Amino acid sequence: MLLTVFKQPVLVESFLPGREFTVGIIGTGKDAIATDTMEVCLKAQAEPDVYSYINKENCEELVEYRLVYDEEAQQVRETALSAWRGLGCRDAGRMDLRSDRSGRPNFMEVNPLAGLHPQHSDLPIIFSLMGKTFHQLIDRIMHSALKRVQDR
């Protein structure tokens, strides 16, 4: 039916009902490091099941962001860092992952040009939750870019 309606190839994927995470990555190649893992927790009044545009744009009322350090979160960090390096991403960005029914993290997307709005973008939010300033985030991004350019 989807092929008939849209008249182009359609990608159908299984819904991942588990926890949703995002991890910041700073650096390039072997020098890349993962930030702490942030879990995206939707509040009762949020659109259910997904970190939608509406939920993100109204995050103060609809979303709770929290840093998590359990075993699943550690797997998320390792997967995110491995994907970042494998894709050849540089300097700074963000990886989104969501767990399946059994709690196994699945890669959803890479954001190699992650938003940098100090209050509304996930990468600065992670840094803030880690007790770091927006200026420290920008400093780390600039340091990575300068090192990469100087190492050419």
Annotate each PLM feature.
Residues 70-152:
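ATP-dependent carboxylate activation and anion-phosphoryl transfer catalytic cores
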Residues 1-72, 99, 104-106:
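Phosphate-binding site of ATP-dependent enzymes
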